[in-house]
A protein has these predicted regions:
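Short, acidic/polar
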Residues: 16-29, 51, 76-84, 145-155, ...
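Catalytic beta/alpha-barrel core
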Residues: 36-47, 69-71, 95-97, 162-171, ...
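Active-site-adjacent beta->alpha loops and helix N-cap segments on the catalytic face
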Residues: 17-19, 45-57, 75-82, 100-121, ...
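Active-site/ligand-binding-proximal alpha/beta "capping" segment
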Residues: 119-165, 239-251
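Short, well-ordered coil/turn segments that N-cap beta-strands
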Residues: 2-5, 33-36, 61-65, 90-92, ...
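Conserved, mostly hydrophobic/aromatic
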Residues: 9, 37, 86, 156, ...
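Active-site pocket-lining/capping segments in soluble small-molecule metabolic enzymes
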Residues: 17, 109-136, 185-238, 243, ...
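Active-site mouth loops of central-metabolism enzymes
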Residues: 5-21, 43, 65-77, 130-148, ...
């Protein structure tokens, strides 16, 4: 069995205070020796400059960075420029996504789907970049069917993606079923589960409603029952997500990718509960 790989996702801070806080978060999480830190791109590429700045800071600290690139709002020339910039910086990993269309933006851009972006990256840069793509164990909310969604995922891998990071989920069976179905189509690329620590229920419910991630009914009802009792929400969430991670790793998941929301403590608590090495 190969060693499990771990990674953490950040979003580019909007304020000077946020930059300082994220630097402190990185310092804490860097002690865990992750494979990389990924940096989001914002809806329609809205954080492009701040994404680049955050990636530069991560590189300057001696860590591996994986910037996100998205189809939405991007032109071929724009993507080409960013690829060359990242290549010159020594970046070797990219997360290629379709991305979210901001309200008011009428056109998605020159790339319609993530597989087109993956193909373009390969055509422009050969095998320089390890390309990560998104996977949806509970299926993309815009997919016509589960089978169609898996075929779409296969197109991204066939276009040149090396591995995938999933949308977060709280039902391990959905992940194992998705991996099994991908395997039946001949997809062998590693599919790393995305992990969302539970910190605030209202925030989690808002994210989940927006992205189509399912909160199991019993989990939702339990969290709702805690009301404003933040300590109970977080204690329950820690137990739930730790058990999820244990089952995923025990079932052969190749690693875990934590959606940190720029906070170290929730991911560290799960890490420590899992008994993973520092």
């Amino acid at each position: 069995m190969n060693k499990a790989l771990f990674s953490f996702e950040f979003f580019p801070p909007q304020t000077a205070e946020g930059v300082v806080k994220l630097a402190a978060t990185r310092k804490q999480l860097a002690q865990l020796k992750p494979e990389f830190f990924s940096v989001t791109f914002g809806a329609g590429g809205s954080t492009q400059e701040r994404t680049l700045e955050t990636v530069q800071q991560i590189k300057a600290e001696g860590h591996n960075a994986a910037p996100h690139l998205s189809c939405v709002g991007s032109t071929r020339e724009n993507i080409r420029t960013m690829l060359n910039t990242y290549k010159d910086m020594g970046i070797t990993r990219i997360v290629a996504l379709r991305g979210d269309l901001p309200s008011g933006m009428g056109s998605i851009g020159e790339f319609q789907y993530a597989n087109e972006l993956v193909s373009f990256i390969r055509a422009e840069t050969g095998n320089h970049f390890h390309i990560e793509v998104a996977a949806y164990p509970e299926f993309h909310p815009q997919a016509r069917s589960a089978q169609d969604d898996i075929r779409n995922f296969k197109r991204k891998v066939d276009a040149g993606a090396n591995s995938a990071i999933t949308q977060y989920f709280y039902n391990a069976d959905s992940y194992f079923h998705f991996v099994d179905q991908c395997g039946k189509l001949g997809v062998t690329a590693p599919i790393v589960p995305g992990i969302m620590p539970i910190v605030k229920f209202a925030q989690l419910a808002r994210f989940s409603d927006a992205c189509g991630a399912e909160i199991p009914r019993w989990v939702r009802r339990t969290l709702e029952g805690y009301g404003d009792d933040v300590e109970s929400v977080q204690a329950f969430g820690l137990d739930l997500v730790t058990r999820l991670c244990e089952r995923l790793l025990g079932g052969g998941a190749p690693g875990l990718h934590f959606y940190t929301l720029n906070q170290a403590a929730p991911s560290l608590a799960i890490w420590q509960r899992l008994g993973l090495p520092k």
